[in-house]
Amino acid sequence: MQYSAIVGINWGDEGKGRMVDLLTAEYDCVVRYQGGGNAGHTVVNDHGKFALHLIPSGIFRDGVVNILGNGVALDSENLWQEIETLRLAGVKITPDNLMISDRASLLMPWHRLQDELEELRLRDKKYGSTKQGIAPFYADKYQKKTLLAGELNYPDSLREHLKEILGWKNLTLTGVYGAEPVREEQIKAWIEEYGEKIRPFIRDTAKILRRLRDEGKSILFEAQLGALRDLDFGIVPYTTSSNALAAYAPVGSGLTDLRLDQVIGVVKAYSTCVGEGPFVCEMLGPEAAALREAGAEYGAKTGRPRRVGPVDLVATRYGVKIQGATAIALTKLDVLSYMEKIPVCTAYEIDGERTEEFPFPVLLDRANPVVEYVDGWHCDISGARIWADLPEAARNYVERIERAVGCPIRYVSVGPERDAIIRR
């Protein structure tokens, strides 16, 4: 397929990074089109194990162009630290294989500060922010109060624009939160250090993408987080502040007339969730601890223990629909190998009524999971490489999910390594 998107179907952390790393062998370009450094895509390959927060997961493939699109929250400090980490591991990163849209807005130090202050203000009603400044950043973007990456090439204009925005931002920091104002000298020093480092990577990437398309090149669009964290269709207000859907790829990349040929939705073989908000099928106690340890379920960015539960067919079916998924990659099937019986959430019960439809967000706190148990396979499947290698119980489990969500499962991962994948 010439134009494909890889997206999350659930709450994020489904394994999108490992799928992009695998599939980049088939693509010429990888584009991150939304989100920022608030989540991580874990990739395991010959270079080592990495949690990529901003850099597209195609960075490990020779000859692949990696682009951060205009829809990304561009944190130049975190981006530069990520570049240095990868270079130390022997990964080649130059302006030829990593490009930043000149239309991407800069996430500034005051965005992280405001994020922390807002979480403190909310106290027990906090949203579980990673405190990377994402919500304040996107709020400012839609108020037209951000600096564009391309402005780094025009220092006189940047200086005037910075002064204007900083004066406005300090009204919020001092008036709403009672914080000290951010000093202009401090921000100028930050820009001189990190803005100058990323400036060679800044290009008119929309123009480059149009050229690649005209040359017949294949492009893979990499989303952050998952459908249930989408700003419009997720579990509001416990969402991210950008659109995590495949439908946003044309806008967030700058290739505005794009028509995707394929949308690969990534689903974990069980459910995980980082942060606050309703999580209907959540496991607690020793059962949760066992699954969390088996899957090493800790946040790639924060290290926070992830909430865990059985695969949620209600939420997954909804995620498949709003993502417009044409195929599914089911990840971490091997993690369930320790279970004699595997729980599956098949429906919700709300106020005494059973439903298989994902409800409006305000009803989620009143929803209880309807759980059934299926036979486990209770053996190591990490060496399986073709469908027939899997035990019958594992194949039955995959096919049950496939039937329930109405979308073909084309990939099944049985380990973190690049080749630990079954194609169907």
Residue ranges, per PLM feature:
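Non-transmembrane, aqueous-exposed alpha-helical and coiled segments at domain scale
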Residues: 1-424
